[in-house]
Amino acid sequence: MIMHSNYDPNIIEKKWQRYWEEQHAYACDIDPNKKKYYVLEMWPYPSGNIHMGHVRNYSIGDVIARIKRMQGYNVLHPMGWDAFGLPAELAAIKHHTQPADWTYTNINEMRAQLKRLGYSYDWQREIATCDPDYYQWEQLFFVDCFEKGLVYRKKAPQNWCPSCNTVLANEQVIEGSCWRCDTSIIQKELTQWFLKITDYAEELLDDLTTLKYSWPDRVITMQENWLGKSTGVEISFPIESSQDFITIFTTRPDTIFGATAIILAPEHPILETLLNDTPQKEKLYNVIEKMRNMDRLERQSNLLTKEGIFIDRYCINPCSGDKIPIWIGNFVLADYGTGAIMAVPAHDQRDFDFCKKYNLPISIVIQPDELQINEHTIVEPWTGLGTLIHSGQFTGLTNKEAKEKITQYLEKIGKATRVVSWRLRDWNISRQRYWGTPIPIIYCKNCGVVSVPKNELPVILPTNITINEDGSSPLPQESSFIDCMCPQCGGIAKRETDTMDTFVDSSWYFARFVDPKNTKQPFDTSIAKYWLNVDQYIGGVEHAILHLLYSRFFTKLLRDLGYLPSNINEPFAKLLTQGMVIKDGSKMSKSKGNIVDPNQMINIYGADTIRLFCLFAAPPERDFDWSDSGIEGSYRFLHRVWRLFIDVQPHIHTTHAGNSTVIETTTALTKDVKRKEHITIKKVSEDIENKYQFNTAIASIMEFVNTLYLSKNELILTVEGKNILSSAIATVLTLLSPMTPHICEELWSYLGHSTSISLEPWPKWDPQALLKDVVTIVVQINGKVRNKFEVPMDLSKEELEHIIFNDTKITQYLEGKTIQKHIIIPNKIINIVTT
């Protein structure tokens, strides 16, 4: 075979991409004789262009997939499209087209871009969420949940984005703004559909322990905090001159004697009763309305300026009998706990800040054991351990003892109940958008709310539709979609016009990939049992709460609905969160003018160079700053590999990686090259398998290539040298092929192989080959290094002593001294102790 003298990626990459596609090289199916491995990267939204963040994410996944195949696994590595969402509607308005047309055009473009990068996807499994063949199953899940009471409809204040014209889930509001467009959100009362994710709160929390060693600590912590489990007590405070009472939630019943205010959320239902006869009713309702319109997450923030107003009513402390003023506070949330708190300023920072601002009393009821604090000099609350004071019959108890004793007392008098509270709220999945999965619900005047019969699914989203210029959904005006017959009574009815949150689409796609062509069910349970769960999932940490939490919930939901096997409790066994690709110190964006176009880079340098640089620039979990010099360096290295192969090709023969194990080496050079070959195999294997440190793995391959460059001219002079060099070249190509598959396939074929390098077994290192023939012995006298010796490995004790004690430098240090003892650690060190 005639080899090109120059490395031209544009020629060889197209050649091998065509070969892989024609051969269906990465297609897979169930094989009971093989151990499976399912690797998946978070799929993209089809915006039309991949970016460098995609390239980094997918390059990491592709390396893992390729190595696992070479290790003998049956590898599932699919790709698809998270295709519903607002951008398609905005593009349709801008370009006067249909969202479906825009979306499918982008899918075609992005598929071609991903193929240009040589990723080893099984494209026969490709799916898109906007395809009715996909979303019909999502609608089926909804109907199942409706029948089992796991989805419900209610009217409540919702996060509303005025720009996107839709509701946002709490998780989609970032610091008071829309997660997508950064517009400040407002509160709007709407009737919405909710999935009962709270039914799974305990399991979602408990099962995080099974992920402790395979998911990043940061993600585990973020999910724990979002779930927000609090074990505490609900305590009833009677309202003065009333039969009513206010129930508060607290985790600190030991501080109840220090409560100096009851603070209500502005949405608390009892306010209507409390304010009914108040002269300041109008003023109070103005304040309440202002608080209600604040962003929910802003109200939770520690940075919030805490505002409140006294409503001129009082509660009675059930322990002390003291009157406590009732306030309304902007930092109290109606849907957390009971929507009411007792403020204990002496022992809580939030309460301290609020009460100091409004000159409310501060009553110390816990005295630290080694510090004296009093109401007049206190500058910050005491939140630690201590002994109760000013607490009636409980004075003198430690606060840990008092928690239980006070709770028991309040339970006895009927004023307390032990409860568990959660920060997590049910998932609002209704969206006032067009381009999404239709919610399969029908509204009938006679029958009420009715689900679409399963045999009538899917409810097809109309695709030839006029998009409203103001961004609102056109579905409410689309009579051909809305008007229908009630499936129960046959009367005139209306369809639901809200569509599902697009995070529903991506919460179960990993399961559809295992059986994507199934037209009878979402996936066959036996097939799911073979492939699931995903062995390695890869994506950004920014999805720690939204996507990853929802996917965990959906896995448990589909298990309980009978779609997934009973032993599948988690979607992703291992999680790798990669950092961002940044440029000039900031995230790439059009507005900053620092975008690097992958297509342009491929045109200049080739896909292998781009892949190599993205893997080499930094450890995967860290951000890396794009640099032109870095990409040039990766390009030069591949040229160097090509040039090395050209130089040695006439002198080497067809062989396999690590074959030097069976070659007997007799010279210092061949022994050294053989040892470095196996050191490299070990280093690359361990760095990738155990730590996913692709950068250090690539660095070790580069070092080995340099070794071969320096030694090739001498190695080609002997048969033994040629044999060692042949094995070494095969090893370089095999180890490098998961990162840069095109160039390695090309050189592998020039080496005389007729099969793809991806079918090669991953090389194994020989422990014996790692050993040096010569070792360095360090000599210490009274703890100080006095000399070093290069000696044959495993030299006998007598021979080693003869060399050391006859060395002039050592004898100089020993002159006039008595040797008390000497200790030899074979092949490493000798310690001599003298007096």
From Swiss-Prot:
Keywords: Aminoacyl-tRNA synthetase, ATP-binding, Cytoplasm, Ligase, Nucleotide-binding, Protein biosynthesis. It comes from the Bacteria. This is Leucine--tRNA ligase. HAMAP family: Leu_tRNA_synth_B. Its EC number is 6.1.1.4. It catalyses: tRNA(Leu) + L-leucine + ATP = L-leucyl-tRNA(Leu) + AMP + diphosphate. NCBIfam families: leuS_bact (TIGR00396). Its main location: cytoplasm. A motif ('KMSKS' region) lies at residues 587-591. It is an enzyme of class 6 (ligase). Pfam families: Anticodon_1, tRNA-synt_1, tRNA-synt_1_2, tRNA-synt_1g. One of its GO terms (biological process) is leucyl-tRNA aminoacylation. It is found in: Cytoplasm. ATP binds at residue 590. A motif ('HIGH' region) lies at residues 44-54. GO terms for molecular function: aminoacyl-tRNA deacylase activity; ATP binding; leucine-tRNA ligase activity. The gene is leuS. Belongs to the class-I aminoacyl-tRNA synthetase family. PROSITE patterns: AA_TRNA_LIGASE_I (PS00178). InterPro entries: aa-tRNA-synth_I_CS, aa-tRNA-synth_Ia, Leu-tRNA-ligase, Leu_tRNA-synth_edit, M/V/L/I-tRNA-synth_anticd-bd, Methionyl/Leucyl_tRNA_Synth, Rossmann-like_a/b/a_fold, tRNAsynth_Ia_anticodon-bd. GO terms for cellular component: cytosol.
